[in-house]
């Protein structure tokens, strides 16, 4: 299992647009083969800070996800909504 944690800081005036795009991305991604969990989360201390926490069966599932129509269409739209560069980290479960 591979976990992806992708953190974004959204421009204050773009939060609503971001959340609309995220809704579609999450709904479609959850239906993909190899997707174990896919959530979008918002910080309790700063409404502009969001993160995806994604659990995938393996790298092949991630590669397939990254090639989907919805990923290819939605992800580029995020770039104009961010206040800062997205931070993405991959994890493996140890316990």
Task: Tell me what each language-model feature is.
Residues 14-37, 73, 78:
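Short amphipathic alpha-helical segments
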Residues 66-72:
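Long, charge-enriched, surface-exposed interaction segments in small proteins/subunits
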Residues 39-48, 76-95:
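Glycine-rich beta-strand-turn "strand-cap" elements at beta-sheet edges
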Residues 2-8, 39-66:
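Short, well-ordered beta-strand segments in beta-rich or mixed alpha/beta enzyme
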Residues 10-12:
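Beta-strand elements of well-folded, non-transmembrane domains
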Residues 1-2, 95:
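Absolute protein N-terminus
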């Amino acid at each position: 299992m591979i976990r992806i944690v992708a953190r974004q800081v959204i421009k204050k005036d773009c939060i609503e647009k971001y959340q609309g795009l995220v809704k579609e991305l999450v709904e479609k991604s959850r239906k993909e083969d190899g997707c174990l969990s896919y959530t979008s989360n918002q910080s309790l201390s700063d409404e502009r800070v969001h993160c995806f926490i994604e659990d995938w069966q393996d790298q092949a599932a991630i590669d397939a996800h990254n090639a989907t129509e919805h990923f290819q269409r939605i992800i580029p739209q995020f770039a104009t909504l961010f206040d800062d560069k997205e931070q993405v980290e991959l994890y493996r479960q140890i316990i």
